[in-house]
Amino acid sequence: VISYGLAAVLSLFLAEVKEEGKERMSVKAFCGSLRQTFTDKRLFLLLLGVAFLNETHQTVTVFLNQLLYVRAGMSNALIGYLYIVVTIVGMSCIFSAAVTKKTGRVFLIRACYLTAAAVCLLLAFGRNGWGAAMGIMVLRFAFSLFAPLQTQLQNERIMMVERATALSINAVIIDSVGVGTNLIYGALAEKSLTAALVSGAALCAVGLVFIERGMKYV
């Protein structure tokens, strides 16, 4: 995770072959986008809220899920089949626009965050293997509906012409937050899987507060 974060940061400084004038404009645009991101507290809260749900979903559905399955006594073959099913559930992102249109943006965001928090709590204190599998699928489904919406929220918040640069900076910030949350999850999981999952529920709750405060100004 740390290597991915460092790679994302370093990629921003890769030099491209272009005319000197255009290069100076690109550097100026980058610095302007960077300054705007760190001085816009509302945008920063929005990115923090997005990062908390992103990383909780990633950690629980990719790493902690295996510990949950093993704790429930599932075989390696069954774990592999469940991984395939969860991957297929991730394709539900194609329904995000339709669901958002019917329920409204705010309702869907709240539902996704609260569902993620509830799933983390159920996984933390549950011991049933199939219950864990269903929880993982529900978490993947909720995040898949939210994923396209978070991109839309970021786009609406960007005020600069260099939209691609601003989105890249947003991605770096989200990934950097992810490095910190993954260190927390890893440290807690080594001591207690329950503690790691409870912290995931807490981050989802805090993330909802952050993203709602950021959305008020989108």
Regions found by a protein language model. Name each.
Residues R42-V86:
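Helix-loop boundary and gating motifs at the non-cytosolic
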Residues V1-F13, A196-R213:
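Symmetry-related core transmembrane helices of the 12-TM Major Facilitator Superfamily/SLC fold
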Residues A15-G49:
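Juxtamembrane intracellular "pre-TM" segments in multi-pass secondary transporters
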Residues S144-I158:
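Intracellular juxtamembrane helix-capping segments at the cytosolic ends
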Residues I79-K102:
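Transmembrane alpha-helices of Major Facilitator/SLC transporters
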Residues A7-S26, R213-V218:
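Helix-loop junctions on the cytosolic side of multi-pass membrane transporters
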Residues F107-L122:
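Structural signature of the two symmetry-related core transmembrane helices
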Residues V1, Q66-G73, A98, G178-G200:
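Transmembrane alpha-helix termini and helix-breaking/packing motifs in multi-pass membrane transporters
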